[in-house]
Amino acid sequence: TKLTETLQLPCGAVLKNRLGKSAMSENMGSRGYTSNEKFNRLYGRWADGGIGLLITGNVMVDRFALGEAHNVVIEQGIHDANLPLWAAAGKKNGTHIWVQLNHPGKQSPKFLSKEPVAPSAIPLKKPLDRLFNTPRALSEAEILDLIARFAYAAKVCKESGFTGVQIHGAHGYLVSQFLSPTHNQRNDQWGGSLENRMRFVKEVYLAIRQSVGDTFPIGIKLNSADFQKGGFTQEDSMEVVKHLSELGMDLIEISGGTYEAPAMMGAAQKESTKMREAYFLTYCEEVRKRVSCPLMLTGGFRSAEGMNAALASGACDVIGVARSHAIQPDFPNQLLSGAPVTSQVKPLTTGWKFLD
């Protein structure tokens, strides 16, 4: 099957197969913002399950800007002696383990952040404004400091034995906020034109590249729905993807819909969900036309048949799985065996209408 093929990334690193675990926040960090034995056990188990690439849950670059209470943080002044053990556990069986680096921007909850920071002082829309305080606009000096923090964290990841990093540019967090004309209304070099709004992610990538060298994988996660909601035209978002690919990005992960079972199949779904799914599919096809960089698609993949079909069509190079891998850690081995397996994962709901 296509799933068992290796993949060489632009930096020269090789993934042993076409399956990747997309980031899911573990929420298991210790009190001092460090990782611990729980991470080693979890990622060791996943590495035994056959997957080619493990992407960790989001690791923050500033202890004063957390997305969740139990995030791990990598910054100067925090010594995490467990990082090499976590990396070693995730590298078993020739598996790649990349750390997802993130800053939440305005999406740091009230109980964690009195005054979150963002490109502009624009609150989140109702009813989310009940959970998050109105942010303060970042100064230029703070923006430069954040770029340096991403680079420092990536260097620590490399020195600790992790085999790559992924910039979290999705789900409305800081990188995504800079890109969005809705959230970024600055009138300096960091906002306004698309070129200016792209400057932050571009500088983060270049700073990381400088700190880790040319042979260490750097990926980014983007969400098609972010672009849809963030006031982007599809053309603008394609420019972002194309630019990142040309800079030398090793893997672009795209989420934001369901690839394998689109809503067009007639399942009872809200109109907004149907539109999002359709957008996601065309989005992925348009990205593929424009970039040479390897693509990882995450969303709704449940069956070996659907995964192989997506790879065979050329739509993507890596299949991203998340919940199915959490519930069945051996799911990759089953898929790679050629068996016609299907994940039994059911959609999760929060009970909050505006989120579900």
What feature does the model see in each segment?
Residues T1-D356:
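Flavin-dependent oxidoreductase catalytic cores
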